[in-house]
């Protein structure tokens, strides 16, 4: 985090010398983006785009990214960090679902204490943890999401936490969260 302070000092000096310095404004926007100050970043990128200079194409792409992040409004530090990734892994998605959506709270609210008979396989599925989650940085979240069957991994089978999530897996995970929380099996 020290580089933020150093970069900020240099960029402020450059902008003090020349208020509309395109490169300094662009890199200030990047610095704010990586500091998770997305609205500030958006403002800097917009300024560069409006200047229509050499950096306007780059700034436009970064401006679009910062706008998407601002609209998504990640509420946790993890959500803000993951928002900057081009692609996310299965572990990243497990963390997002657990932290941003607070899946355990949703699941507890949607499942009443006497919610009916469970077969032995359902009981085992609720308590099984993936064989490759142990020792992983996202172990707690992976186990939480696996316990509810949101991201598929057969009991005792690998979760593949570092594999990039594809659209189908993402859609199925969201569909499971929605169907479990709304009670709609369809």
Model-derived features with residue positions:
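N-terminal propeptides
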Residues: 2-9, 16-186
